[in-house]
Amino acid sequence: MSLRLTNTLTRRTEPFTPLTPGKASIYCCGVTVYDLCHLGHARSYINWDVLRRFLIWRGLEVTFVQNFTDIDDKILKRAAEQNSSMTEVSERNIDAFHQDMDALGILRPDRMPRATQCLDGIRSLIGELEAKGAAYSADGDVYFAVMKHAGYGKLSGRDLSEQQDNAAGRVADAEEARKQHPFDFALWKGAKPGEPSFPSPWGEGRPGWHIECSAMVRAELGDTIDIHLGGADLVFPHHENEIAQSEAATGKELARVWMHNGMVNVGGQKMSKSLGNFTTIRALLESGVSPMTLRLFVLQAHYRKPLDFTAEALEAAATGWKGLNAALGLGERYSDQLGWPSPAALSEDAIGPQTSPDAEALQALEQQFIGSMEDDLNSSGALAVLFDLAKPLRALANRLERGDEPGLPEADIRNLAPRWQLLRELAVVLGLRGETSGQSNMDDESIDATIAARKAAKAAKNYAEADRIRNELTAQGIELIDKPGGITEWIRS
């Protein structure tokens, strides 16, 4: 694999080399669960879902961790507004988050720790920093001393001395007055009346935002990970502070690669809840925008570039998805009428794309797809391959949908079957699927057993049964990827 990724830390696009060959450890900053997710969240998590899918498709064993921030001032404020509790607000919005991400076909992370579940690790990490002189107590709070960490500012390019000069003579609030430097940040916040609090060596209180992620990365993945993900708005202060506190504690690099997606803009401004110009994922879907249209809209732009949200752009994505969806559904709906082997038979090596009369052209398109994705996740280039594959399939699907004859010689129709097979496989890598798929409640063992039954049916040339099993799994949100040598991999939608 020749994957190259843009590393915010080095400001270069570099070859990706995992810490452990064949494996990748990834941490993605999750949401603060005080409200519904908006389109900016959708963009971020769709982009990183595609990164994960591509790594899996290329044979890596990926461990993907994404957190929930369930202790925060915003959650406390929302709880007060709703006459509720921090826990109740968090639980409601965690449930809503899962519903939204499932609808968009985003694979669930392998683990999703919550800040409230990691308090022991948080307190331990703060204690280590204090023992090393990188943190100090002040009136029940504990702060990280940025001047004690030589590398502070390496991710964002912030200059500490310049910030110190700018702050000189400024009238500070009570918290600023307790800090040794304007960039010092809270690791532990002393308890306030009426707010939830937790015991600690520094008194009752709650953790700061940044230390939560450092503790969860360490607990779930270790001191150093392969890739750390987030939006561009997290570079400073959140990710800068994560690096400082983690590396001050361990003396090791926190992440080899830092990746950040661009923002969604509305009228030239970043979409955000603070500006009030956001559109929730739920509102978009309830307005009739299909989940795959939204996914296609996001993937048409490079993940690092700003994405302008307009009605025209969304309509263009809807048109594009309509054509792709028609092409993807061709083999499922019309294989008998076209005289194609069943979808299960198509996955057999003997009649796959490799032996098609168009084998060279199909292989070139697959390599073009891989090349685009390996070029810093160029999803728009990868989509161009899907549209190229889909063009003759879509035209044929449209004729059949109208009740017309196929209008092609029998040999040409048969030669389109491997093309459809490749389209379906590459679409799974981008998370694009027919929208009748649901969510599976099957456990891994049941899925593996069902796939084994499908493999046995194929070996017995009982392709109708193999197709029935595949369709049953698809209906439950289990996507199958048939590979040469009779290997079948699966992922949950």
Swiss-Prot record:
Q: Which GO terms describe its biological process?
A: cysteinyl-tRNA aminoacylation
Query: What name does the UniProt record give this protein?
Result: Cysteine--tRNA ligase
Query: Quick one: where is this thing mainly located?
Result: cytoplasm
User: Motif 'KMSKS' region: where?
Assistant: 270-274
**NCBIfam families in alphabetical order:** cysS
Binding positions (Zn(2+))? 29, 213, 238, 242
Q: How does it assemble?
A: Monomer.
E.C. number = 6.1.1.16
Q: Which domain of life is it from?
A: Bacteria
